[in-house]
Regions:
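Detector for outer-membrane/organellar transmembrane beta-barrel domains
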Residues: 260, 299-397
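Residues on the lipid-exposed face of transmembrane beta-strands in outer-membrane beta-barrel proteins
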Residues: 43-45, 63-69, 79, 120-125, ...
Length: 453
């Protein structure tokens, strides 16, 4: 309890300072931004309060120092660290074992409420015509908003489901990234000797997965279940990932062709049923399997309208089945997904965006716990005011198949270039069987800030 009060006091104190500064700036006090420096830092606080029970879900302080140093021959060394302190420890209670994370990529835990992490550390520069970046980094594929399709190079932390921005929820990996020009195109080649997978919330976490399509159907009442830790591949050489992307421009269209040989970052709930003792016993041993990905993206602007598209075929994906006669409780198939996005800028200072995500299983056996064609729709409305310093937006994500979804209204104010404050709501709806509806009790109000130092 003293530790919680201490962290909470520090977070509230830091939170109050930029909010009062924002109020003074709004009534006319001048503010200036610091110039570029090789060593910078960002400090921020976000407070999330459940709207149903009034209980705090998190009050988290984060400090992110950033290094940018010039090296000989035009190379640069860049690094980002992150220190976090949470007053309530509801997202991942206790000290997570981080079984899904490779040892050289894990966070350092200091008790239950404080952790430190090396987010990025890489050297980049040119060698002849090639551009090289080596080290811990993020690799971004695709342009979809709200949900992901082609952006599968880096795994993701799901401690707050899909609520954080992708830049914060991605788990940077140790990667060799080489980009070489080929005529008017650009070839990117990746080698990733990092066996980190998605960071899945523990079963007592606030956003722990419970939807059957993610974790499989539960056994009948009274049947004991033993769930083991995920069996993560551990050899950084033999189990490394490789990928390539060819990007170019043709008749007004930005085009990419993408290929990735990697492990699916979602643990597969392999299941066995033991009948030897006379009473059925269920054992779930999550594991990972290779999933080749082939895809691409297109985009073009037609006046005020931008058209975006992505496609990704995951050739070997495993899905849970409720067929009790199935040997391991999962089936293998090919998952072909695509997204079509339209961005309209026809109104002053306004963006209206809509996306259709669809995923099709080429083989859909009886008992598979998801429809053969799965569809989601997203709608984004964003308007800026006061010379683009005040942003008001709402994003709506809707599952067509399950009827559940997520609505996220938000207001953000840029007090100055290095100080932003915001407030908003995250509202889930639907049944517990849906990917969004499983968090229907977790609706929340959030307020926070980020301040560059």
């Amino acid at each position: 309890m003293p530790a919680r009060r201490g962290v909470a006091f520090a977070c509230v104190l830091v939170l109050a300072t930029p909010l009062s500064f924002a109020a003074r700036t709004a009534i006319g006090e001048p503010a200036t931004s610091p110039g570029p420096r090789p060593l910078r830092a960002e400090i921020g606080v976000e407070w999330a309060v459940g709207t149903r029970d009034g209980e705090s879900q998190k009050l988290r302080l984060h400090v992110e120092p950033e290094l940018d140093l010039a090296l000989p021959r035009g190379f640069r060394l860049k690094g980002i660290g992150r220190l976090r302190a949470d007053a309530f420890d509801e997202l991942e209670p206790g000290q997570p074992d981080q079984a899904e994370i490779a040892p050289y990529t894990r966070r350092l835990d200091f008790g239950d409420r404080v952790d430190a992490e090396l987010r990025e550390l890489f050297v980049q520069g040119r060698i002849g015509p090639a551009w090289l970046r080596v080290g811990k980094q993020q690799v971004v594929w695709g342009q979809a908003d709200g949900l992901k399709l082609l952006d599968v190079v880096d795994p993701q932390s799901f401690e707050e489901f899909i609520l954080p921005v992708f830049e914060d929820s991605r788990i940077p990996l140790w990667t060799v990234d080489v980009e070489v020009p080929i005529d008017d195109a650009q070839l990117q080649v990746l080698w990733i000797p990092d066996t980190t997978m998605h960071d899945i919330p523990p079963r007592d976490g606030l956003f722990a997965f419970t939807a059957p399509r993610l974790v499989g159907e539960g056994p009948p009442p009274g049947v004991p279940v033993r769930i083991e830790d995920p069996n993560r591949p551990s050899d950084p050489l033999r189990n490394s990932d490789v990928g390539a992307r060819l990007a170019g421009f043709w008749k007004g269209w930005d085009l990419t062709a993408n290929a990735l040989w990697h492990y699916d970052d979602i643990p597969i709930p392999f299941r066995t049923i033991d009948l030897d003792a006379g009473v059925p016993q269920v054992r779930v041993a999550p594991g990972y399997r290779r999933t080749p990905v082939l895809g691409g993206s297109v985009s073009n602007a037609f006046g005020n309208l931008t058209v975006r598209g992505e496609m990704a075929a995951q050739l070997d994906r495993w899905f849970p089945t409720d067929d009790v006669t199935d040997r391991d409780g999962v089936v293998r198939t090919t998952d072909v997904g695509w997204v079509l996005g339209l961005d309209w800028y026809g109104f002053t200072d306004t963006l209206l965006s809509a996306q259709l995500f669809q995923s099709f299983l080429t083989e859909h056996r009886p008992g598979v716990i998801r429809d053969q064609l799965d569809s989601n729709v997203t709608v984004l409305a964003r308007r800026t005011f006061r010379h683009e310093t005040l942003t008001v937006e709402t994003i709506w994500i809707q599952s067509i198949n399950d009827g559940d979804g997520l609505v996220r209204p938000r207001v953000e104010y840029a007090v100055r270039d290095d100080l932003q404050v915001w407030a908003g709501f995250d509202v889930f709806y639907g049944t517990r069987d849906g990917i969004y509806g499983e968090f229907d009790e977790n609706d929340r109000f959030v307020i926070g800030f980020e301040w560059g130092l």
